[in-house]
Amino acid sequence: MRIKVRAPATIANFGPGFDVFGMAIDKPFDEVVVEEFNEFEIISSGYPVPNGEDNIALFSAKTLFKMLNIEGGLRIKLKKGIRPKSGLGSSGASAVAGALGAAKLLGVSNDELILKAAMKGEEKASGEPHPDNVVPSYYGGFTVIESKSPLRVHFVDAKLRGVVVLPEVEIPTAKARKILPSMVPLKDAVKNIAMASSLILALKEGDLETIGRLLDDNLALPYRKKLMPWFDEIRRVALETGAYGITVSGSGPALFAIGENLKDIGKTIVEKFEELGIKAEYWVTKTGRGAKT
């Protein structure tokens, strides 16, 4: 029996929703082919990732076996389509693909259990079980995390098109979290609450200009910009080119912008990066479906 699973990249935080908002996008994605085997084995292609015990897809699959007290094994062939350390939920997608592939092989359909195994994989990769990547990659669409334990998720019916720009810069999630303060000024917290609440309404109404204006953040971005000294200049160029707004995806360096002329916006940002001596690529994307077999 062979199972094929695709798990999409995600835009986590989505502006003011730090550790809460996340949206699946239609590309890129990680793909696994899972089959029965007498031990646990991983074969990977695409972007380079660890093999063996440190592979997140394999770790998540093994975690599900342990949770179910099932002995045995499986072989995973991973086609890594999401660049690691990109800010696009690379480890979360691998975790979802591995856990869901194992679940399908075992005939398990318990969403909560599968997500728990995937979040263990995400925790191994980044030090914390981030549901704002794992959950939208699993379910698709735009998700809001009410709580991690117990896991409570809300869904927003949002259909967006945007442009992702990915510079050739790596920002490990653990490093991006370490730079954050343990406390922030009250006025910054209040501002984020206002923006996040308004963003949900704008998403429901499909108000692109308002959504763009609200793609901002006072909790993490002011501190993480130290790891992205080019951000303010890139943001200025994007807005001048017609973007309604631009934000950092996850912990970066990937950027997500919305507007009308998405190809022009992406091309202009890439050209600006090249002026700064940084290679970059862009692609137009949209709200995506969740992991599927």
Swiss-Prot record:
Subcellular locations according to the entry: Cytoplasm
Enzyme class: transferase
Biological process, per Gene Ontology: threonine biosynthetic process
Matching InterPro entries: GHMP_kinase_C_dom, GHMP_kinase_C_sf, GHMP_kinase_N_dom, Homoserine_kinase, Ribosomal_Su5_D2-typ_SF, Ribsml_uS5_D2-typ_fold_subgr
PANTHER family associated with the record: HOMOSERINE KINASE, HOMOSERINE/4-DIPHOSPHOCYTIDYL-2-C-METHYL-D-ERYTHRITOL KINASE
Family: Belongs to the GHMP kinase family. Homoserine kinase subfamily.
Name this polypeptide is given: Homoserine kinase
Organism: Pyrococcus horikoshii (strain ATCC 700860 / DSM 12428 / JCM 9974 / NBRC 100139 / OT-3)
